[in-house]
């Protein structure tokens, strides 16, 4: 075959593939007149017919659409289970997730979707979202500004689009007693943010990002949001060869300070949260992990203004366990919220899977209990269905499984507390500091001269066993 003929054949094949991909993004054939090229928000009837409100049926239930461990009104250690968790549905993963990936077209053709990105479609999607939360029994939701409303041709038009959708959300909230756990601005998808938002080398981009966060803060406040999150997916660098790190970090700090100032100006009493992540999409993000972020806040005088939103999958990407990140945040009094998800240990990227590991859930809940809960934060399911999960009921099953897993972890923590053996093991491990000299050291009065005298007096120390295997046995006994 000649080169020219081969080129024509390849182009034809490419066009056919593009057509096939596009076809998968169009309106599903089985919903007929409800789906038109000109999007309409006049959907009739339920979005999830045949699915009733999800109820607690106990551990013996074999019914997929029921809670086995999560009993919202049950009181455990002085709080209702729903108040320990304050569960939230993530709008973007749940209602904007398409199943598409770099190697394939979208796989999820939800019945209410019509293939457009119109305001009418955004309204229909919002209504489906609230019906989903009502049936799930979840009282909070989280959103990015650009996920709930489409971009316009100008910033003013985009803000007007957002206002229109927010009014609908406000109405739906008043009808359901559901409100945002947190809101945020999407500062990573649009090409203008390819070099970052608050760390962009272009001042016009910095100003645009500031305008977007200003609006998102105001919208979150208007909807009664309890928190506002900053996730800097592109606040970092690809190479240091073209990067002035000092200047970018200072710009980021000034941006966050401006957000603090605006929060106070509009009377927003919610908590500002920073969500650490080491990389992806940027090669190296500035908020690598909890410790790095805390150091940044200390350096720029922002402690007391921000807390941390720990995402478990981000923790593992940074080389830590979720438990480590939670404890680092907790002991520094900056634990504000948890994005409950997990990653796949066999891959090196952010897979955002629903957490179903009972052991991991128990460790997470041990930190939450020691923190006396997360309010005004909570647990947001920053997780998405697998690409191959395409049934509408899978949306419910995934959230039920995630909520049951966390509830089971919470019940396991009660077992550990009531048994007391693990806590006693830890106490005994440090009991040598429960002495006069130990108390002096912990009070910061252990000078080297005094300690040297003691070392000469005591001679070679006898070091006891760490009892790690026993600790693991005691922990496993509660699972």
UniProtKB/Swiss-Prot annotation:
> In terms of domain of life, where is this protein from?
Eukaryota
State the InterPro entries in the record.
Answer: Xyl_isomerase-like_sf, Xylose_isom_bac, Xylose_isomerase
Give the first-level EC class, as a single word: isomerase
On cofactor binding, the record's note says:
Binds 2 manganese ions per subunit.
Q: Where along the chain is Mn(2+) 2 bound? A: 311, 314, 350, 352
| Cysteines joined through disulfide linkages | none
Activity as a function of temperature is given as: Optimum temperature is 60 degrees Celsius.
Kindly identify the residues recorded as the active site: 144
Reaction catalyzed = alpha-D-xylose = alpha-D-xylulofuranose
GO molecular function annotations of the record? metal ion binding; xylose isomerase activity
Q: Which GO terms describe its biological process?
A: D-xylose metabolic process
Q: Where does Mn(2+) 1 bind?
A: 275, 311, 339, 382
What keywords is this UniProt entry annotated with? Carbohydrate metabolism, Isomerase, Magnesium, Manganese, Metal-binding, Xylose metabolism
Reported EC number(s) for this entry are: 5.3.1.5
As for pH, the annotation reads: Optimum pH is 7.0-9.0.
Subunit info?
Homodimer.
Q: Output the HAMAP family linked to this UniProt entry.
A: Xylose_isom_A
State the similarity comment.
Belongs to the xylose isomerase family.
Name of the molecule in the record:
Xylose isomerase
Native source organism of the sequence: Hordeum vulgare (Barley)
Ranked from the top, the taxonomy reads: Eukaryota, Viridiplantae, Streptophyta, Embryophyta, Tracheophyta
């Amino acid at each position: 075959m000649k080169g020219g003929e081969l080129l024509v054949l390849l182009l034809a094949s490419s066009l056919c593939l593009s057509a096939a991909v596009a076809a998968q993004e169009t309106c599903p054939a089985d919903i007929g007149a409800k789906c038109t090229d000109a999007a309409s928000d006049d959907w009739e009837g339920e979005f999830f017919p045949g699915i009733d409100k999800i109820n607690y049926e106990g551990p013996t239930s074999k019914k997929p659409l029921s809670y086995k461990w999560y009993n919202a009104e049950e009181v455990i250690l002085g709080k209702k289970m729903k108040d320990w968790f304050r569960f939230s549905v993530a709008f973007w993963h749940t209602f904007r997730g398409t199943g598409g990936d770099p190697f394939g077209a979208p796989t999820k053709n939800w019945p209410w979707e019509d293939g457009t990105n119109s305001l009418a479609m955004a309204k229909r999607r919002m209504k489906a979202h609230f019906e989903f939360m009502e049936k799930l029994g979840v009282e909070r939701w989280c959103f990015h500004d650009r996920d709930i409303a489409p971009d316009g041709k100008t910033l003013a038009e985009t803000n007007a689009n957002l206002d229109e959708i927010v009014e609908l959300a406000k109405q739906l909230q008043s009808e359901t007693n559901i409100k945002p756990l947190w809101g945020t601005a999407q500062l990573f998808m649009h090409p203008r943010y390819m070099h970052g938002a608050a760390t962009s080398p272009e001042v016009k981009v910095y100003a645009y990002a500031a305008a977007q966060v200003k609006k998102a803060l105001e919208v979150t406040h208007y909807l009664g949001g309890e928190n506002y999150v900053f996730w800097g997916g592109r606040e970092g660098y690809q190479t240091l060869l073209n990067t002035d790190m000092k200047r970018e970090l200072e710009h980021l700090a000034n941006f966050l300070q401006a957000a603090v100032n605006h929060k106070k100006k509009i009377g927003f009493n919610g908590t500002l949260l920073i969500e650490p992540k080491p990389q992806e999409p940027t090669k190296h993000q500035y908020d690598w992990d909890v410790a790095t972020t805390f150091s940044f806040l200390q350096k720029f005088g922002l402690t007391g203004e921000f807390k941390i939103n720990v995402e478990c999958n981000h923790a593992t990407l940074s080389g830590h366990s979720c438990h480590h990140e939670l404890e680092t945040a907790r002991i520094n009094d900056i634990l504000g919220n948890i994005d409950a998800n997990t990653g796949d240990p066999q891959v090196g990227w952010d897979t955002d899977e629903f957490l179903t590991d009972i052991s991991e859930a128990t460790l997470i809940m041990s930190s939450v209990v020691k923190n006396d809960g997360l309010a005004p934060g909570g647990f947001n399911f920053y997780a998405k269905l697998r690409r191959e999960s395409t049934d509408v009921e899978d949306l419910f099953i995934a959230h039920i499984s995630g909520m049951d897993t966390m509830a089971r972890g919470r019940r396991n923590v009660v077992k550990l507390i009531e048994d007391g053996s693990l806590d006693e093991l830890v106490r005994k491990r440090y009991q040598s500091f429960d002495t006069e000299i130990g108390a002096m050291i912990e009070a910061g009065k252990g000078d080297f001269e005094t300690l040297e005298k003691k070392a000469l007096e005591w001679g070679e120390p006898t070091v006891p066993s760490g009892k790690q295997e026993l600790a693991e046995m005691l922990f496993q006994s509660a699972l």
